[in-house]
C-alpha cells in the first residue's frame, strides 16, 4: 500500500474529510431513506421501529454492494485534468452538507445530488481542472428525464390499480412480477460478472454458469431466470391477495419498501463517498469497499437514529395518499434508482419519489397537485445546482489561502 503524504497536516485532513463524509452519509441515511417504508407504516403493515431497523440494514447492504458506480462518478468523473485532494474533498463535502442542512431546517427542497454534484464541480474548477462536458450532458439528460418518466410510470401504475376491470388480485401481482424481474437483473458488487465488469446480476451469473444461446442479443439463460423470478413473485403475491386483498397489499408494500430501501442506499452513498475516492483509493491505497464501508456506516447510523422521527411524519402523508398512489410512487423510484446506479449517475432519491407522488396524484385528478409547489421545487433544484458550484469554488479557495496550499 502506498500512502501519499505523511505529515501531521495530511493525516489531520484525512480525519476531517472522513468525519465530514460520515456526517454527510448520516444525513443522507436519516433523510433520504424514509420514503420506502412510509406507505407500509401508513397501511399498518409494519411498525415504525421495525421499519427503521430494516431501512438501516437494507440501505447499508445496498451501499456496500451497489454504491461504487456513482461514487466513482462523483469522485473522478465530474472534472478532467486534476485529482480531488483531501482538502478539496473536505471543502466539497462541507459545501454539499451545508446545502442539505439548509434544506432540512428551512423546509425548502434541496436535492442532495444537485448540491454534491455542484460542490464537486466547484472545487474541481478551483483546483484548475476542466469541465467534463460529456459527463454533464449525460447527467443533465438523465435528470431532465426523471420527472416525466417517474411521473409517467406512477400515473400509469396508479391508473391500472384504479381500474375496476383489473382486480387487485391481478394488478398487484403484476407489479410484483415487474419488480421481481428487475431484481433478477440488479447489478451487485458481490456477484462476479462473466463479462469482467465490476458488478454482476443473478440472471447474468446463471447465464455465465449455464451456457445458453443468444437470440437478437438477448441471452436466453438470463431471460429465463428473469421470467422465473418474475413468475415466482407474481404467484407469491397473488396467493396472498387471494387469501386477503388487504394482507396481500400489505405484504407487497413491505417487500417493495425493502427493495426500494436497498436501492436508496446504493444510489445515495456515492454522494458522501465520491469526494473521498482519490484520497482513499489513490493516496491511501485502500480498496473501494473500504470507502463504501465508511459511507455505509454513516447511512446505517442515520437510518437508525434519524429515520424513526421522519417515518412517523411521512407515514401520515402517505396514509393520506392511499395505498394505490403510494405503490405508484415507489415502483418508479425502484426502477429509476437502479437505472441511475447502472449508469453511474448521481441522483437524489427524494426527487424521484416527489415526481412519482405527483404522477400518482394526477391519476386521481389534478386537484391535489399544486402547480405553484411544483414550480418552487424545480426553481430550488436549479438554484441549488448553480449556487453550490460557486460556493464550492469559493470555499476551497478560502481553505487553500488559509492553509497556504
Please place each PLM-identified region on the residue numbering.
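Hydrophobic alpha-helical segments
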Residues: 1-405
Amino acid at each position: 500500500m502506498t500512502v501519499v503524504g505523511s505529515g501531521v497536516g495530511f493525516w489531520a485532513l484525512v480525519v476531517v474529510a472522513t468525519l465530514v463524509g460520515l456526517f454527510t452519509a448520516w444525513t443522507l441515511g436519516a433523510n433520504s431513506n424514509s420514503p420506502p417504508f412510509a406507505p407500509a407504516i401508513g397501511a399498518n403493515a409494519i411498525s415504525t421501529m421495525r421499519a427503521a431497523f430494516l431501512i438501516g440494514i437494507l440501505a447499508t447492504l445496498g451501499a456496500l454492494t451497489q454504491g461504487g458506480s456513482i461514487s466513482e462518478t462523483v469522485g473522478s468523473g465530474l472534472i478532467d485534468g486534476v485529482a480531488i485532494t483531501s482538502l478539496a474533498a473536505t471543502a466539497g463535502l462541507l459545501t454539499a452538507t451545508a446545502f442539505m442542512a439548509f434544506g432540512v431546517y428551512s423546509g425548502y427542497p434541496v436535492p442532495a445530488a444537485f448540491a454534491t454534484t455542484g460542490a464537486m464541480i466547484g472545487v474541481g474548477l478551483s483546483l484548475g481542472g476542466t469541465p467534463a462536458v460529456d459527463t454533464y450532458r449525460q447527467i443533465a439528460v438523465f435528470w431532465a428525464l426523471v420527472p416525466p418518466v417517474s411521473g409517467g410510470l406512477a400515473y400509469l401504475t396508479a391508473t391500472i390499480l384504479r381500474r375496476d376491470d383489473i382486480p387487485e388480485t391481478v394488478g398487484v401481482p403484476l407489479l410484483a412480477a415487474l419488480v421481481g424481474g428487475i431484481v433478477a437483473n440488479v447489478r451487485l458488487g458481490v456477484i462476479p460478472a462473466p463479462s469482467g465488469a465490476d458488478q454482476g446480476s443473478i440472471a447474468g451469473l446463471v447465464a455465465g454458469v449455464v451456457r445458453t444461446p443468444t437470440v437478437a442479443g438477448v441471452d436466453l439463460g438470463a431471460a429465463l431466470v428473469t421470467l422465473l423470478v418474475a413468475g415466482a413473485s407474481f404467484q407469491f403475491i397473488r396467493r396472498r391477495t387471494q387469501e386477503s386483498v388487504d394482507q396481500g397489499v400489505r405484504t407487497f408494500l413491505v417487500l417493495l419498501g425493502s427493495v426500494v430501501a436497498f436501492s436508496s442506499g446504493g444510489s445515495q452513498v456515492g454522494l458522501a463517498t465520491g469526494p473521498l475516492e482519490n484520497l482513499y483509493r489513490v493516496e491511501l491505497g485502500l480498496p473501494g469497499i473500504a470507502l463504501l464501508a465508511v459511507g455505509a456506516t454513516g447511512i446505517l447510523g442515520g437510518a437508525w437514529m434519524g429515520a424513526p422521527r421522519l417515518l412517523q411524519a411521512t407515514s401520515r402523508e402517505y396514509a393520506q395518499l392511499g395505498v394505490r398512489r403510494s405503490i405508484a410512487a415507489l415502483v418508479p423510484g425502484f426502477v429509476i434508482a437502479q437505472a441511475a446506479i447502472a449508469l453511474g449517475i448521481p441522483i437524489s432519491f427524494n426527487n424521484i419519489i416527489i415526481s412519482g407522488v405527483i404522477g400518482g396524484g394526477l391519476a386521481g385528478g389534478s386537484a391535489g397537485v399544486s402547480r405553484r409547489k411544483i414550480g418552487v421545487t424545480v426553481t430550488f433544484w436549479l438554484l441549488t445546482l448553480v449556487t453550490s458550484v460557486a460556493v464550492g469554488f469559493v470555499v476551497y479557495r478560502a481553505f487553500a489561502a488559509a492553509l497556504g496550499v
